């Protein structure tokens, strides 16, 4: 796993944990969790590291603190409903394996992280995709436009935004009926990204 990828995961883990801790009343937090809110903690955790081994240890620390926080709030329905806690509940199993025998979470290798796993603590719908050798984090947009030479102006006739793990052809297939109904479409020209075997 490259340092850049690992640093990104560590930063994401910090953001998720911090949001979850801020969603909790301070009086239920142990000191180990309160320190995450200190400004110096972020600097020490994310930037004062020596090598991949230390980064993995810090990532494991974030997972452990998050798992402990979920145990602390598990009987508090009012807190479990909060956004920061919901994000943490999703994040931990995406980033770690649970060993039922040891009752511990262990950080997953980068290759074991699913493409639809959380990429941002602030926008949980953002996904990761490696498309044609290029890495993309975010969403994908498909736009349909008129393209007849006789039109004085070409007009956007349809657009769709979705998780970027969805293929172009799948998005077109979902929107084609609507586009045809709205535009009286007779011919459709597409780029190579929309091709797929049926």
Residue spans of the language-model regions?
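Polybasic low-complexity intrinsically disordered regions
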Residues: 1-187, 192, 197
